[in-house]
From Swiss-Prot:
NCBIfam families: PRK09285.1 (NF006764), purB (TIGR00928)
Organism domain of life: Bacteria
Cited SUPFAM superfamilies: L-aspartase-like
Lineage, broadest ranks: Bacteria, Pseudomonadati, Pseudomonadota, Gammaproteobacteria, Enterobacterales
Entry's Gene Ontology molecular function annotations: (S)-2-(5-amino-1-(5-phospho-D-ribosyl)imidazole-4-carboxamido) succinate lyase (fumarate-forming) activity; N6-(1,2-dicarboxyethyl)AMP AMP-lyase (fumarate-forming) activity
This protein's name: Adenylosuccinate lyase
Amino acid sequence: MIASPLFAISPIDGRYSSKVIKLRNIFSEYAFLKFRVTIELLWLKKISLLQEFKIVYNKDVLNCLDRIIDNFSKKDALEIKILEKKTNHDVKSIEYFLQKKIFKCLGNHDILGLVHFGCTSEDINNLAYALMLKVSRRDIILPLWNKIIFEIKKIALLHHNVPMLSRTHGQPATPSTIGKELINFAYRLERQLKQFKNIEILGKINGSTGNYNALHFSHSSVDWHKISQEFVTSLGLFWNPYTTQIEPHDFISEFFSCLARVNTILINFNRDIWGYISLQYFNQTPKLDEIGSSVMPHKINPIDFENSEGNLGLSNAIISHLIEKLPISRWQRDLSDSTVLRNVGTVIAYSIIAYDSIILGLKKLKVNTSRLLQDLNHHWEILAEPIQTVMRKYGINDTYNELKNITRGKRVTSDIILKYVNSLKIPRNEKEKLLQLTPENYLGLSSKLVKIFNNSSELK
């Protein structure tokens, strides 16, 4: 086995391996096996305690099962994989492995016959995937989203009143502030974050076609519907009482749809920041030993935002197939979801790489105030909007077309605007307000909106 990232086929385990180390404990083959071993043994504990099974359940049994979970190792995982080569069935191999382990510490105990009792493979697998997604959301995804929002808000609050020329259709438009334009993204992200946190992660354990057939036939006096609910919810999951052989994966589609929406918002963010860097509204702090180009020594490229955009695109491309394919299964089940589900870690890995790049890029940004003011002062034509609005307020007709003729497609200076304002027949106080107006201070509520958002935001 070649362990070096140099020989990895995927850049996830190669070039970017250091960025996704934490995911290996959730989505690797080893982790998947450990989750399934844990679920098998927790189910074994659950049913062996039922009085209908008449199992002698003592401290030795409990300690044996707990030790198998707590001490699960790479050696154990490899043993399961060796068994799988013979059986060509991953979950049956886990069952044989557990029977062997339990026999070693308890001998020929009655509990051996209850390993994987009344289960179908999907009873174990769906719960494993549910836990994997639950843990990744709690420990990996949400903390990174919070960090991105925090970094965006930090820059926004620091520059809440720094004026910036807006651009609609790529052309000069009504000014905003650096802070307000960043807060737009923070608001969008927070909204998705709230939805993501509230997505119910479901699980089921109800047999080969979702009807408890084997369980009910063997022990009809047991309320298996209730036992199923108790077991699933004990794992910190929501119970799905109505399924075929498989949990239908609707929640996984919801989970990744929300992830894709966040990724799409961040692609938008990356492109906007890339553009602002190109306009020199932001500068990037150079690192002494870094090189921007193999031939152009002066270059400081927006590589973090470009890297993030590319990896978010890869993640969303796979998500597109996940959310379309997973909720569809032929009749009571087909196996086409199995290979797709094995790629959920890949999806999240590409996203994590992208999130790290955004955070790195944000920490390098410096607002270039002088360039922002220079751009604003080059576009006095944007004041046509407030001037014509005030004129309309006082019933002056055809103001829009009059200002259109003066400003549209022309280089407009402060002198042209001031001369026009002085010619207006409006109250003196209104004229004074217009004469004091500049592209730099025509900001509406931009700065205030940043503070309002910060005060109402749940993420501090």
